[in-house]
Structure formats: C-alpha cells, structure tokens
Amino acid sequence: MIDNIWYKPQLGILSYILSPIAFIFSKIAHNRKIRLQNNQYKSKIPVIIVGNISVGGTGKTPVVRMFANQYLEQGKKPVIISRGYGAKAEKYPFEVDSKTPASVCGDEPAMLFDALGGKVPIVISPHRVDSVKYIEKNYPDADVIISDDGLQHYKLARTKEVVVVDASRMFGNGLCLPAGPLREPVERLKSVDQIIAIGNLDNQNYSELLNYNSNIVRAKIKATKFVNLVTKQSILIDSFYGKSIDAVAGIGNPDKFFSSLDELGVNIYHEHIFRDHHKYTPKDFEHFDPEQIVIMTYKDAIKCKDFAKSNWWYLDIALEFC
C-alpha cells in the first residue's frame, strides 16, 4: 500500500519520483488557501476546527466527541458539522437523527450521534459553510460549532484550530501528496492554536513538534468498555481476557485497534481487515464461525447493528490526557 511507502524511514524511490508533483501540489494548496481566505464566511457562532495535516486516521473523531462532552458538561449547546464521507443524503445540509443509517450520513457522523446519545445536533454537507448557515438558522442559540475535520476548508473562518497528530507515525517522509501523506507542509503547524498528539510521543518527536508549536497536549486512546451490538449491554474491559475472538476493523489504521485488544489480553484468533468506510453486509461474515466471539470497532459496529449476532461486541474508547 502507498501509505507503507510514505511511512518508511528512508525516502523510497516512488516518493522520490513523485516529489516534483508533491511540490506542485503544495504550491497549489497554498494558493488555494490564500484565495479562499480572502473570501471567508465568518459565523457569529464560534467555530472550532478539529483536523490534521496528514491523510488517514489520526484520532480526530474521539477528540470531537471529547470536546462535545465537555461543552455538554458545562451546560452549553455544541453542534457538530462534518463532511460525511461517503454520505448519500437526498439533499444537503442534512441533519442526522436516530433513524439515519451510516450509509446516508457517513460513518463518523452516525457514530458521533450514537455516542453522544443524540444530545448534540450533527449536520453534514460537502460544503461546511452551508452547514454553518443551517445551524445559524435552526440553532441560533448554539454556543459553539465543532467541525470534524475541515482544517483545509478555508472558505470557513474559524475561531480555533486544533490539529490531531498520530504520535507514533508523525508525518512519515514529510512530503505532501502524492509523494507523502501530508495535505499541507508541516510548517502549517506554526499557525494552529493547539496540537493534540495521540499515542506514545517520544522525546525526539516531541522536540520535532516544538519546532513548530509550543501548545502541545499529550493524549492517548483508552479502552473503556465492551458493548453488545444487539442488547447494548456494557461489560468490563477485562471481560474477554484470555478468550479467543475474531477481530474486525475497517478503519484508517487497523493495527491500533488490534494492539488495543492485545493489551487487554484478548487472544485474536483472526484479524479481519476491511477498507476504511467499508459498507458491511451479512455476506462479509458468512465465513465466520458462528460460535466465535466477534469484536469490532465502534465505527464498524454502527454499520453492522442491523444484522448483528448476539455474540458481537464493539470496543468503546475515550480520549485521556497524559
């Protein structure tokens, strides 16, 4: 896979060949940024962008969930906007509700709505400004708009920018697409308000981040409980210690999920890896042993709940600051 090339210690020959294109890409991205910033839409409601400068999963959605919960605990009214990757809504902006399947609104919005108990309005649209205008009209008393991703959506003015970094992978070879994993040059970090580094941030990587920004928060993803897809029963995190299970992951970085299960002492009999944003059907599980316990990510569970078996569980997680 191309991301394996991006994250190799040495610059691979393919990345070297693509580096001129990456240079052109970064220049185009920079010019686009300036053009859009000159005609930004500024909302009266504060906007917090939770994004990243690299492609793939860095942990943005758990951060969005954490921010939303914090505002709820403070008695405030947050609203979330999202691109809704893979969404098939009939019209946009589209507001998610309890009956909206992930196939209509996208994986992350469906998961966030479920995780937050429907207490936070979630609006999706390919054009975030349209979502903001929808919120201004329908939720004029909202205290804050949290954008799940959208750092590069410069048409929308923002009050605060938070960049999420995978502390274990950092920025790979440091090149922009397509030669590397970066959407923007790493120097972009100099202008953001905060960096949240998720995972094991060693001294070398911490020093690298300090070259660009001093407001760095260390965090880790903590497993909190297992939840049954059918009954919604929650059980303790050590409930499957020493037990053999099938693990299912259709996320940007499945190894993280498998490592989490390993750390919990779960014996993974088989790792089933699907593409990120995979649209599950019962056929995907026809070859599974019906007696074997299945554990998947929350994001996958949202798409499997309609045909789940009684021995299917998902691992719930939370962000914990170090």
Swiss-Prot record:
One GO CC term, this protein? plasma membrane
Annotated binding of ATP, by residue = S54, V55, G56, G57, T58, G59, K60, T61
- Keyword Chaperone in the entry? The reply is no
Which GO terms label this protein's molecular function in UniProt? ATP binding; tetraacyldisaccharide 4'-kinase activity
State which Enzyme Commission number(s) the record gives: 2.7.1.130
A Pfam family recorded for this sequence: LpxK
Annotated coiled-coil segments of the chain = none
Biological process according to GO? lipid A biosynthetic process; lipopolysaccharide core region biosynthetic process
Pathway in which the depicted protein is active: Glycolipid biosynthesis; lipid IV(A) biosynthesis; lipid IV(A) from (3R)-3-hydroxytetradecanoyl-[acyl-carrier-protein] and UDP-N-acetyl-alpha-D-glucosamine: step 6/6
Which keywords are on file for this protein? ATP-binding, Kinase, Lipid A biosynthesis, Lipid biosynthesis, Lipid metabolism, Nucleotide-binding, Transferase
Q: Which InterPro entries match?
A: LpxK, P-loop_NTPase
Q: Which reaction does it catalyse?
A: a lipid A disaccharide + ATP = a lipid IVA + ADP + H(+)
Domain of life here?
Bacteria
Q: Which HAMAP family match?
A: LpxK (MF_00409)
For this protein, the record's PANTHER family field holds: TETRAACYLDISACCHARIDE 4'-KINASE, TETRAACYLDISACCHARIDE 4'-KINASE, MITOCHONDRIAL-RELATED
Q: What does this protein do?
A: Transfers the gamma-phosphate of ATP to the 4'-position of a tetraacyldisaccharide 1-phosphate intermediate (termed DS-1-P) to form tetraacyldisaccharide 1,4'-bis-phosphate (lipid IVA).
Family the UniProt entry places it in: Belongs to the LpxK family.
NCBIfam families (alphabetical): lpxK (TIGR00682)
Q: What is this protein called?
A: Tetraacyldisaccharide 4'-kinase
Source organism: Francisella philomiragia subsp. philomiragia (strain ATCC 25017 / CCUG 19701 / FSC 153 / O#319-036)
